[in-house]
């Protein structure tokens, strides 16, 4: 018998793709950065250190002073 895991993601909110873009009169512009490795959209994190992170390949760019 094969067990199928339960989907517990019903309570979590999903990312809305339309919030990633800024629409002007004749152009559409991406708000976030794109990953230089894989090309997916990167997330901007503020804590514990400010950084840009890719959830797909794990590439991370740290912003600000180094310790």
UniProtKB/Swiss-Prot annotation:
InterPro entries: Ribosomal_eS31, Ribosomal_eS31_arc, Ribosomal_zn-bd. Its cofactor is Zn(2+). A zinc finger (C4-type) spans 35-57. Belongs to the eukaryotic ribosomal protein eS31 family. SUPFAM superfamilies: Zn-binding ribosomal proteins. Part of the 30S ribosomal subunit. Zn(2+) binds at residues 35, 38, 54, 57. Keywords: Metal-binding, Ribonucleoprotein, Ribosomal protein, Zinc, Zinc-finger. SMART domains: Ribosomal_S27. GO terms for cellular component: ribonucleoprotein complex; ribosome. This is Small ribosomal subunit protein eS31. Binds 1 zinc ion per subunit. Gene3D superfamilies: 6.20.50.180. It comes from the Archaea. It holds the Pfam family Ribosomal_S27. GO terms for biological process: translation. One of its GO terms (molecular function) is zinc ion binding.
């Amino acid at each position: 018998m094969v067990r199928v895991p339960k989907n517990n993601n019903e309570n979590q909110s999903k990312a809305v793709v339309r919030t990633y873009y800024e629409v002007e009169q004749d152009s559409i512009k991406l708000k976030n950065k794109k990953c230089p490795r894989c090309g997916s959209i990167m997330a901007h994190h503020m804590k514990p250190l400010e950084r840009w992170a890719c959830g797909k390949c794990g590439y991370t760019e740290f912003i600000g002073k180094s310790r």
